[in-house]
């Protein structure tokens, strides 16, 4: 079968395009020269034009140096008269390509060996994936999937660790809140249930009973005896006794702090009363010493007592001077 005009550019100079025919028995193109190996190269280039685009992408990256070596080997055979046996064996190797694109299946024959360099691995994987999607995954894809799964596993572990950390933090916070609630409840119990309110109430009841007994036995504005909590006896006026009685009766319904404050005020009143008693006794002594001072007020009594003491001092000094003179 003669070649068309588009295929003439693949033929070297000095060859007749009409002499390149197809041998049906051997299934490859043979030019009208005594070198069938060179005809295989031209037949492969002719078949390349009838391949589908995926196969064209494969065959377009065929190593041209191998083709050149075959041509140089053929040229050496023409000059020397014999070719190496290895070159003939390599040139006789053929590859069959199945084209299953569309609904048709075609059998194509390639006249030269296909070699896939390391740079074509990615493209080969893409073409195989397009032809057979279920088998088109290479080892690199498997490794990448393993890496992605490992990263997802690590991310899942990190997420689980973060979740566990947050749960522990929440548990600690809730435990702190529970502890605070327990402390508050303990404080409330200590302020209400554990307070010695009953003892103080019993003491107040004892004082009120003693005051009632003293009032029933004594009538009028007389001094009365009051027995305190420390079992000490002090004199007190009837008005003070009345106030203490009212306070003692009202202390039963008062809290612990009020009872302690009332006790402190009671002790302060007793101290103040003792001071007043001492002042009254001193004023009575001055009234008895200073002539004409009975029935006077305390300030006037003090002034007269001072003047009287000065007069006594002067008289004493004058008497000493007279004694020294004699």
UniProtKB/Swiss-Prot annotation:
Superkingdom of source: Eukaryota
Q: Which Pfam families match?
A: bHLH_SAC51 (PF23173)
Q: Which InterPro entries match?
A: bHLH_dom, HLH_DNA-bd_sf, SAC51-like
Example GO biological process: regulation of DNA-templated transcription
* The keyword DNA-binding is assigned to this record: yes
Could you tell me which residue ranges the bHLH domain spans? 263-312
Spell out the molecular function terms from Gene Ontology.
Answer: DNA binding; DNA-binding transcription factor activity; protein dimerization activity
Q: Name one GO cellular component term.
A: nucleus
Principal localization reads nucleus
Region Disordered, residue ranges: 175-194, 234-275
Q: Which UniProt keywords apply?
A: DNA-binding, Nucleus, Transcription, Transcription regulation
Key word DNA-binding present: yes
Acidic residues composition bias: which ranges?
175-189
Compartments in which it is found: Nucleus
Residue stretches of biased makeup (Polar residues): 255-271
Self-association and partners = Homodimer.
Q: What is this protein called?
A: Transcription factor bHLH143
Organism source for this protein? Arabidopsis thaliana
